[in-house]
Amino acid sequence: MAKRLWIACALFFLCAGAASAQDAKTVLQAAQKAMGDVTSIQYSGTGHLNFFGQAWAPNAAWPTTNLTSYTKTVDYNSKSAKENLIHSEPTPMVKGGGRPFAGDDKQANFVSGQYAWDQPGAAPVPQPGAAAERQLQIWLTPHGFLKAAMENNATAKKQATGTEISFQTGKFTVTGTIDAHNMVTKTETHLPNPVLGDMLVETTFSGYKDFNGVKFPTTIVQQQGGSTVLELTVNSVNPNPGLNISVPDSVKTATPPAIKVDTKKLADGIWFVAGGSHNSMVVEFPTYITVIEGPLSEARSLAVIAEAKRLVPNKPIKYLINTHSHFDHSGGVRTYVAEGATIITQEMNVPFYQKAWAAPRTLGPDNYSKANKEANFLPVKEKYTLMEGNRTLEIFHENGSMHNAGMLIVYFPKEKILEEADDFTPDLPDVPAPGGIRPAVFIANLLKQVQALKLDVATVAPMHGIVVPFSDVQKAAATGKG
């Protein structure tokens, strides 16, 4: 009897799965018929583009820019896409981070199969780390979703808003909704993010219209991490334009750049750790090490941790000072928790990190997710001092920052060294200085804080760029550049 019951249950679930797949096929075929089956598509419009991970405060929206021109061309057969856009800073200036620029910022982004690259000028710039997401974005478009669902044994489930279709492509699960009119109204998936873990990416489609026999939405909104990254009003659609992309040889042969660590001693027991786009500092105390800044990723943090242990052997890393919550400056912080360090950050960041770090990390597990440790925080309100033996390090909340509400700066009174992040980036040889109004605003506030706190600064150690005398900051503030 028990055996017959087990067989009956197995047959029930097998049949239910087959029915779900069959239902999905029927729904997808109806949607393809209603929307029009295409091999490629091009759509253009205007709207807003947001700087992901650069919110002014935890849980605030990503800072927005004006998207004055946007065209995306997708070829589904060759799994290729080209994205051309122009965006500009809004007026008045918005709070938050993001790459500063003056006037119009033009971008050309490509993906073809396993290769991704940008083309800001004549020479392509390989972007191997972007290939997986850009490829996935092809299947998050309405027609791309239908094609990928048909090819990947999708399943169907009835919901109040329509039929939910789900399928697996590689390690990613993609889900979408098809409404009663057979239109794709939403697609969603998750991407790995060093701060947010398995991060929800949700794209909604509305205002469908007929463009030369093909139905396409006139409003597209994509959110990542719960906040909008793209809001597009579509004004032109070209079905089946074709897309002939040839992957440049330099892109085919490109490999991810090796992580470099270039260390400069600033004073006894104080080192500036550079070698990439973001810097850190290693500070020796009599019985422990403090590291300032855990940017980018776990890989970067592991390299800095190894360097800290080389510089100061046989001492534990007790503290990691996180200057602010922007993702490029906090992507490697969790690695220090796994190392056993306490995280010093402005108090407003603590609830944000606690919530973000509790999210699942099935797509990109890191050392902290494997360590089974609880994160310890030392929240800073306005000032906190680390003092042991002859070493004194002062941490201040930078009030009035338009870049980040929880910005911290670090000062060494004996050595007259100031650490700062994103307020001032020294000019580098052969690298154009950032434009726009934001650098001038940020540097003016930094100088105001230094004066208000009566800090006697001789040297500035920035988290981008090179170590410079404080007089460079004063000159930049006087000329309105930063």
Report each predicted region and the residues it spans.
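Sec/Tat signal peptide C-region and signal peptidase I cleavage site
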Residues: 17-21
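Divalent-metal (often Zn2+) His-rich catalytic cores of metallo-beta-lactamase-fold enzymes
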Residues: 447-482
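Conserved beta-strand hairpin/beta-sheet module of binuclear metal-dependent hydrolase folds
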Residues: 264-308, 407-426
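Gly/Pro-enriched, hydrophobic low-complexity segments
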Residues: 160-249, 408-413, 420-421, 426-427, ...
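Zn-dependent metallo-beta-lactamase
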Residues: 231-286
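Flexible, processing/modification-adjacent segments and terminal tails
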Residues: 22-29, 33, 99-183, 189-199, ...
